[in-house]
Every structure is written in C-alpha cells, then in structure tokens.
Amino acid sequence: MSGRKSLLLAVLLAALSGGVARAQDAPPASDMLLATLWTQRAVEYRANALAVFSLARIRLDEALVDRNWTAAPAEQSGDFQNLPPAVVLDVDETLLDNSKYQVWMMRTNQSFSTKSWNQFCAAQVSTAIPGAVEFATYADSKGVKVFYVTNRGAETEKDTRENMQRLGFPLGGNVDTFLMQAETPDWTSAKGTRRAYVARDYRILLNIGDNLGDFDDRYRTSEADRVKAFEAGMPYWGRQWLMLANPTYGSFDTAPYGHDFKKSRDEQRKSKWDVLESWMGPSP
C-alpha cells in the first residue's frame, strides 16, 4: 500500500472512530428534555414565576386584613380568626430549582430513586426559583410564619435547611418550620395532615405549590378525579392557592398510566400518547 493510501486510510479510520465516540457520548433521548430546558433556561419561565410571587404579595396583604381568610378550608376549623398568620409553601420546584438533578437523570439515562435524590439534596446545589426568596422574606417581615411543607424525606432536613439558609430563606426562629415527609408516622406524601398541624396554631393565609398534591390530597387519582378536585378548588385558585408551572414532573405525568410505577418506560409513554387529543391533519 502506498504512503498516500495509508494516510487516507488512517484519516478515514480516525474520523469513523471519532464519530462512534461522539455517538456514544451523546445523551439518550428523553421525554424530559424540552420541559427541563424551559425551566432551567427560558426567560419566559422566570417571568411566570415572578408573576406568581408578585401576586402572592398582593394576596398576602389582602389576607392579613380579612380575618376570615384561610387557605386551608379542609383543615382550618373553629375560631381561627385570631390565630397568628402563616403561609404554607412547597419547596421543590416552588422555592427551589432542582433542574440539575433532572439533567443528571437525562444524561445518565437514570430514573428517579430516593438514593440518588438524597445524594443530590446533600450536595446542596439547588437554586432559588425567581421571586421565591423575596416573597418569603416579605411574608416574614409582615410577621407571617413561613412553613415549608415538603415531600423531601426527614433524613434530608439538615441539608435542605442549610441550602435554603444560604439562599436567604427565613428559617422560622425557634419554631421548626420545615415539615418533612415521614417526620412523623402520619406525615405521608399527602400533605393534609401537615396542613392540619399548622392550622392548629396558625391561620393559613396562602398555600403555594407546583402540584395538585400541594393543595388537595386527591392528587394521585385518575385524570377524571383530578379534574373534579381541581374544579372543587375553583374558589381558591389565584386567591388563597397559587400554582407555579412545573412541566418536568408531577402527578399530571403519572396519572395517564394510573400512577403504576412498575410499568416500563415504553408502557408509560404509550399511556400518555393514548390520552392526548390530536388534530386529524389537513384534508386530502
């Protein structure tokens, strides 16, 4: 083989091997890509979050004046009008941006696991959702106790508290305002028992979250029942209850396949396609 042919062959082999390496390095396709890109990079998402927290300030001021105002209709009872004020805030994707964990899952083709999630929490790399710190400190300045009702496990409380303290969130002084999942036996992923715990001693002015489960315990039901729960809360949406957008994960994502996490990714994806309505396309 001539020297020129040998050189061309070497160049060709190098190009092919480089292409194989690039193909191997490329992250696998993921259903979460567009939603994660939006929450992490889009100014439209930031504007949406700022709008929610700006409205929250307005609603908070209204609630402080109206002593009959409560954001916990199912849990607040008796003569609550003279109780000290509080707000109930979800943490993940309401106050803290965890999109870095989503990106890690996509790049490594991993699904959510408690082990990796707790390791992410321990890294304390979550950032603040736009407007979240400012609203929490505003509420605190008004004498409103800020409770963080989160489905992070109790084992992550120290890391969560330190992460949020560093970002500037008020911590509650001598009151434990971090109400973690499984901190007590009846504090399950459904948050009603924790809202009831707060409502015993405080008038809950606002409830802010990113998932139906932050407001109503009927979140992990069928799509039809979720619609009924949403409609039952119509008097509260936009007033006592404020919702941030989170297209990356949540009970909306699992409802099409009945929240059956034993189903494969392909089965889950098929169930999602099955519930979507489509245009039939242009006429022939």
Regions found by a protein language model. Give the residues of each.
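Substrate-recognition element of Asp-dependent hydrolases with the DxDx(T/V) motif
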Residues: 93, 123, 132-165, 212
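Bacterial N-terminal signal peptides that target proteins for export
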Residues: 1-8
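Second-shell loop/turn segments in exported
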Residues: 38-49, 118-126, 147-153, 183-184
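Active-site neighborhood of HAD-like aspartate-dependent phosphohydrolases
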Residues: 84-86, 95-130, 134, 141
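C-terminal cap/substrate-recognition subdomain and adjoining C-terminal extension
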Residues: 54, 153, 157-284
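Surface-exposed patches in mature extracellular/periplasmic domains of secreted proteins
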Residues: 64-76, 146-151, 173-176
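Bacterial N-terminal signal peptides
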Residues: 9-17
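Non-catalytic pre-domain segments flanking phosphatase-related domains
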Residues: 21-89, 258-261, 265-266, 270-284
